[in-house]
Amino acid sequence: MTQEAHSTKDTESDWENTWGGKIIFSHGTSAARGTCIFIKSTVQHEVHKKIIDSDGRYVILDIEIEGIRLTLASIYAPNNDSPEFFITVRNLIESLPNDRRISGGDYNLVLDLTKDKKGGQNKTKTKSQKIICEWMNNADLIDIWRHMHPDSLTYTWSQKRPTRVFCRLDFFLISTSLVDDIVSAKIVPGFRSDHSAVILEIKLNKTIRGRGYWKLNCNHLSNLEYINTIKRTINETVQMNKESNPNLLWDTIKIAIRGESIKFGATQKKEIDKEIVRLEKEIQRLNELSTNTPLSDTDEGYLQSAKTSLCTIINQKAQGAYVRSRAENYEEGEKNKSSFFNIEKRNSTKKSVNKLRISKTEVISDQNRILDHMKTFYKTLYSQKKLENSNTFLSNLSPPKTVNEEQSIIMTKDLTIDEIAAAIKEMKSNKSPGEDGLPIEFYRIFWEDIKIYLFESYKFSLQEKSLSITQKRGVISLLPKKGDLLMLKNWRPLTLLNVDYKILAKLIATRIKKVLLYIINEDQTGFLPKRFIGQNIVSMFEIMNFCDENELAAVLISIDFEKAFDQIDWDFIWDSMNFFKFPPKIINWIKTIYKGAQSCVTNNGHMSEYFALGRGVRQGCPLSPYLFIIASEILAISLRSNELIKGILIGGKESKIKQFADDSQAISIFDKESINATFKNFEDYGKVSGSVINFDKSKLMRIGSIKDSLFAVDLDYKDVKWTNGPIEILGINFYSTFEETTKYNYEKVLEKIDKAIQTWSTQKLTLFGKISVINTVLLSKLISKLSSLPSPSTDMIKRIENKFIDFLWSSKRHAISKEMLTKNRSNFGLNFPCIATKDKSLKMAWIKRLLNSDADCVSPFLNANLKVGFDTLFRCNLKKSDLKDCSDSQLPLFWKQTLEIWCEANYRSIDQIENPNEEILWLNSNIKLDHKTIFIKEMFDNNIVRVKDLQKDDKTWLNFDSFRTKYPNVKINFLHYHRIINAIPIEYKNNRKGNDPKKTALAFSLCLKKFQKLIITTHKPIT
């Protein structure tokens, strides 16, 4: 609590940015009054009601803190006798339904004239004093500092001129029911104010927070004394343990580093704390001395010097907290730093479990019981389960691709120090370390000192097939998911692993990742380079569109595996790797880092005992996603090869499953046998892999001709739910119609943008800062939708942009036009985003994917229904209005919009054609018959593609006889041939070279012409 804060509405956001938590203000002016209550970001709380004085005199809260509800009041009383003020405050506090009350502040009066005041006039009790005393008696309130220091003569305010006066004007009144919860109450000298601070320490929540585990203070890494100490420690430890094996030596080095780091930090803290105590005592001594007699000039100088020194130390400590809170970003020009853009997430995540439901009727809050239950839960979860032998399951399958000999050789090369150094360089900073407390920053600073010992430890581990003791250990930290947080299943376990383990895991992951791109079907888009999450979403739209167009009854099956990463069986992973012919050496390396793995659970700073792991891939390990998708590819192969499952056949390719890591969707015709076979396939896979279907979250959605019906088949799996939508797939809520899906998802984006704007509107940002937030934070809510959904309506785009503009100008009059805002800064704009342009640029990226990937995987519908292949289509000179000519079937809306955008960017009018002879004849909006572009498959199949293919070497046209001689397999008549020749513009016939190609008039956020050129030049030319 602060009083006489001089806060105003203009300074509010500055204070909040610096504090990092929540502040409830009652503003005064910049020169008078103002009071507020600060709530630390880590304190779990809920404000039920707040009463705020408009004149800056009080803030009164009905608040729940750590599960305890109470009334909290910060008071700044007038400096005259104002009984009406105290009556008002009393009535407001008593109007709140709480019997626990804490009222603190500057009351501008003393309660006991004999103990709380010295000097000045000893008046009888004022009317205000009487009101306070009566209220204390009637409401069971006590002056807690006086209660704990009954005979102390300590004051919180002093006046030296014209009359020497000392008073205790600042105090806390608390309910007597809270006395047993008080840890301490003390007065500490002020150094920036004429008031001393009153500190009340109260333990509302009986939960005692543990010490947690040691983590290196990264500030030490910039301290030369610390660096020299650690270098010396490493050398001494190595000299003393020369005979130890490399693993034992490495662990010993880490233990020695930890010991010296703790010692260094403790010494620094002890020295600082000792100096603070010394200065406080000196200030207190001089203050007490001044109550009896005026200080000499020398003593007055000592007092001011002590206050200045104390202020400096406190400021240094505050600066550390300030930096840790990431508030310094506001003073660094709102740079594009992750910590700046994480304000939305900061402090919003509940990180500890204070209550837990262990049965239908019992909720526990005792930390020991909670930790015990957590340990039992995760020990059981990660214990190996008896499963069916996977050999039978795998023997019925054939891998489409396996690791070849060349890949095996590359994958199993010996590790090198340079490879380790590269991995360390790539790893992200500012991440929580594992149990040894050493972050990645430590490895970078001391790399030259430790590299040989770390390298030898890895070599020894892989040779002996066992990591060092510390490398085997992980600390499970829990993050909340959706749902009831009293249930442990609604918390996600993230394992904090030691950095030396993560480096080795990353080295292995980097090697196998390259191979996975080759052996994993493109139906799996998770974690692999050149795979895109939106690919699955677009595929779902394509399948739904195909079923609609062909009146096909089908179902979309969304399967949820319960704790999929945590339950996957290790033996099944090894068997899966053998199935794909991974070399034994790499499998043994992975087995080595899993052998003897242990974890403990941390909660509220307490840590459980370590327990052994027997299954699951740890979330937090660089290898985990790749091991998981190797195992889940077995599921996909089994579904594709299962003849009882009837998928959707599009363009010769049958779609049965789409995957993103553990997120799986199956597709089947509306047929009982096929749907039952699908679920049985998932079930059989679970029997050998450990995966368990969560039927509560698994759904069947009707699509195609039955999308609006309530049809269902009587399945063998009774728990599965039927629906017409929505089904959430990778963040997109799918309904049975495109219109409903598109509208719903963009409306949800609008809600998220609104919520984010509410958060950011409280921050004091410059215009450039707001533009950064719009382009980075707000626009990010939209990007994934624009990338994989049909374009938003014009009205929706306008609504979104209006929200951005209102945020930019704080809902006030716009100072700059939108057209000017969208220009770049070199043209005096602000780079304000144009949603329509951003949408176009994101959809253009799909053109590159179509060209650089297996087109049949990206879009089997397009691949089957376009008249020409993608390589040819994207060289055709089509107008947007002629796009319909490229396919005999109606294009799905997403692809129609994407190809229209390409046409806008790519089309060149006749006078823009640079080399007419090189122009493609077909699907060319400059070459038409009967107002339609031309495409004659027979001619195209006989390599007649460009204008030059109908010309002689001297650039004159082939006559009909010459044409038939050159292309004997083309069966067209004389009239048809000459109609084609006559359709070619005269400019082409004259081989007139036009102007240099103009750049597209579209002001795309990326240069689409360059993008087009980049795409085209990466592919072989059409001959």
Where is each model-derived feature located?
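Conserved pre-catalytic core of RNA-dependent polymerases
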Residues: 341-344, 406-634
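Extended C-terminal regions of large enzymes
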Residues: 786, 800, 812-1023
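Short, conserved micro-motifs composed of acidic
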Residues: 15-16, 148-165, 406-410, 605, ...
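Metal-dependent phosphoesterases centered on the DNase I-like endonuclease/exonuclease/phosphatase
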Residues: 1-28, 85-176, 226-228, 232-236, ...
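Short, charged alpha-helical motifs in flexible N/C-terminal segments and linkers
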Residues: 272-379, 413-470, 476, 548-553, ...
